[in-house]
Amino acid sequence: MFTLKKSMLLLFFLGTINLSLCQEERDAEEERRDEDNAKMEEIKRGIFSTVFKAGKGIVCGLTGLC
């Protein structure tokens, strides 16, 4: 009976550690995805701003209304 309790306690302990490690890995992966998404948003904003400025320059040059 005592060895059964020790075995169950050991399995519970190992399962708890395993669950904790899985959660840490999942959190780290979510952080990487968030960083990638933030980088993509920054790139999109940079491209949009550049295109907008270029379009504004072209319109200003063609019409002379600046």
UniProtKB/Swiss-Prot annotation:
Belongs to the frog skin active peptide (FSAP) family. Brevinin subfamily. Expressed by the skin glands. The lineage of its organism: Eukaryota, Metazoa, Chordata, Craniata, Vertebrata. Keywords: Amphibian defense peptide, Antibiotic, Antimicrobial, Cleavage on pair of basic residues, Disulfide bond, Fungicide, Secreted, Signal. This is Nigrocin-2ISa. Residues 1-22 form the signal peptide. Disulfide bonds join C60-C66. It is found in: Secreted.
